[in-house]
Amino acid sequence: MNGTNRPTEPLSIAFYTSMLAFLTTIGVVGFLLFMAIWQYTTVGKVIIEILLSLIAFIGLFWNVYFSVSSIMKCFIPKKAFQTNTKYCSVIPENKPKHAEWMDVTIQIPVYKESLQEVLMPTLKSCMVARDHYVKNSGAKCNIVLCDDGMMVYLKNNFAAAEMMWETIEATKGKYFKLSQLLQKIPKPSRRHLKGLSSHAVYEVFHRMLYYYHYNIGFVARSTFDRRGKFKKASNCNSHLRLSWGAEQLSEADGISFEEALIENSHNSDGSRFIMFGGDVSIGELQLINDADARMSESVIIKTVPEFLNDKHLGFTQHATKTLDDQRRESYYINMLSSYTDALYMGHFLLSSILGCHPPLVGHSIILRSEAIKSCGRIRTLRKAQRWLNNIGLPFLSVDQIGSYNLQDNGSTEYWSECHVSEDFELMIHLYNLGFNGRYVNYPDCEFQEGITRTFDEEAGRHRKFALGAHELMFNSFNNWLGKGPFTPLFSTFLRSDIPSYYKIYLTSYMFGYTSGGCYILVFSIAAIARLCDVQQEIGFLSAFNSAGVLALSVIIYYVIGYTTFLFAMIKMKFSNNNLLFPEYRDHGVIYLCWRLIRYCMYFQILFYSVMGNYFFLGSMDHLMSRPNICGATNKDSIKITRCIAFCDMVRFNTGSWAIAFYLLVLAYLTVLKDADWKFDQWPNDMLGTFLFAGPAAFLALSAFYVPIILNPYILGWPFNPPLCGKKRQAEKKKNKGGKQVVDLGTFMAQTDSKLNKEIGRAENKPDVELGSLATNDFGRSNMTTATPFTNYHKTAPRKRPEGARPNQLTHAEKQRSRREANGNGASQRFTLAMI
């Protein structure tokens, strides 16, 4: 007996919404083509009109769908907000009586984020959720960090990593100072640290110490051969290949899982390519979390019954809001946090209730492990078939290729490493394989994520989204002749058994990133045709009206869009107030509407007036096979001056400003053309010229001032300057006596206080190269004290010149340090003082 009574079919509104939007778009494009033929004057004008009409389909598809779906969301019945629907869960389900709880693995890909500022708060929330699930279910739940920064710090020195981790395990993590730990290491083994930065060694030591104390597994791969445009996919794959490969090896050879892990982490020549520690096994479910994201205590135990009741459920996407610590950090954070809340609390939730499949955004998700394995086998099969086609062999079935070859974990891509939007690509694969997704918005079970702090970072993310959307749909230009315009993945998606209304929804959503750049292309064609029209044969173009496009966008997004969205949010508040985030739940309707209009709409007006340039750049990055220049989002706090922020802004917006300057030149040339190329006269048809060139000039000018307005590090005072990442020291609680209960929070507070103190001490030391460790190690033979440099500090201090700083070396000490460095590779005393 299942613990669910959700409907088996989505609401019928979704079908009517998609069909109406698609037919409306076809009707508008057909009308434009009819007008082009009906108003025939010259062959050139007809060709231009037809070309612009076909391009207009891409731009209109998302706009029409957005306006139609916004109106339809107002007709969602009240009952849908109070019960679970096919693709949305607002009430936790009950576990089936005879079903067993599933093992869960929390996987967190990290790089070089700050342990104290970013990783610790995230891991604390994960540990609380882990222990809550284990205590109440009896099942297994482990945390694994895919640490891509560890080997970067250690310069791919696996011997040093093994030495430090094995010593931490042997000493049971009781040494919080690196100098104390290194005393337990034999002198010949310390040579592995030679040439490493002292700060890098400190960072790795603190990470390993934290992982050990809180029973957190970690996987650190080699810095060589890290495939993928963005390393998150290959980082997660390294953990999946290691664990699942060890499981297969353990079953095949009859060895233990730990022995299989060690064998699977080494190359055939005995060299190591991946480091691991702790429990790195993978459960039946995987929770993917970002390095700067927090989760609620009960989110796992409330979500697992969803997978137990539906064997076709491949993933759940959870509602996510902005970090509480980051809210109100600056005026930009206020606007972006309101926009993020509206996205997850409004559009994603309403679309899922409406009947559309939820998106998979890459974090705050729970995935079924078997579904990920199926996607990996499909990718391997396609690679094998492409290889057979290249050498001229016919198509072979899975049985002929061999199931074992499809499970070669040394090269299987469970997450796509050749796509920028690996999460979106995985979602399409899951839908093609027959798995469903579900949007989960349990009350008080929201995830929290960090958001970007500047316009440049957010614009870079949207440029990456545009690149990923085009990568999924279209081949690059150099492959069009041989493979056609559409990718095999997108063609398979269109031919799959997925309901047609969802194909329309997903296609229109991806075309939304194309429509932003369509205006630049369409305006360029119309303006160049107008400039080359010497005989005045083209005249007015029915397929393109610059002012009409701008007015249509304003009407769709800010009149129809916000009117219907606010109506749907008000209806949801009165139907089920618990669906709103806590920041909006305790306030009235006026506060909800005012905050969404004040921050969210104002942000969209400014932000998306410039995003067309970045959508165009992202599409050209893929279509012209250009290397992507957008990096990962910075998760650490930013502390920079106004001058540095301005220079970074100029450097990032060079491409956008080039497009803006190009649009300004075209607009100005059309004005001169209408004025008979006379600089001191206005055009005869002033209104027509302004309606054609004015919107393009407005969008071009926006590209210059919006990046400055939306950057709080440039404006600063009086616009609520951002907090510059000041570290908050934990308050020491006084023990007032009584019975002391040692729980997880107390244990973490005690351990964190020691580790935080040691991290602060290490950060205040200068960064030096550990060069003397190969010969002199850390101490002499007569050193028996707790720290390896005690004898050095016990020597009588030399008399310093009057007025010298406390840490300033005298001339004689500098000479002696140079002599020791020349004789032993580096100054032993100087190196020991750094440690």
Locations of regions flagged by a protein language model:
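Hydrophobic transmembrane helical bundles of polytopic secretory-pathway membrane proteins
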Residues: 1-89
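Loop-to-transmembrane boundary segments
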Residues: 2-22, 107-119, 486-515, 593-597, ...
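Membrane-embedded multi-pass helical conduit in multi-pass membrane proteins
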Residues: 29-52, 505-623, 648-733, 738-749
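Internal catalytic domains of large membrane-associated glycosyltransferases
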Residues: 61, 65-495
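Acidic, Ser/Thr-rich low-complexity segments on the non-lumenal side of membrane proteins
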Residues: 90-134, 145, 603-614, 741-760, ...
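Membrane-interface alpha-helices
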Residues: 136, 613-641
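A membrane-cytosol interface segment of integral membrane proteins
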Residues: 137, 146-158, 162, 634-682
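Intrinsically disordered, low-complexity cytosolic terminal tails
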Residues: 190-194, 734-835
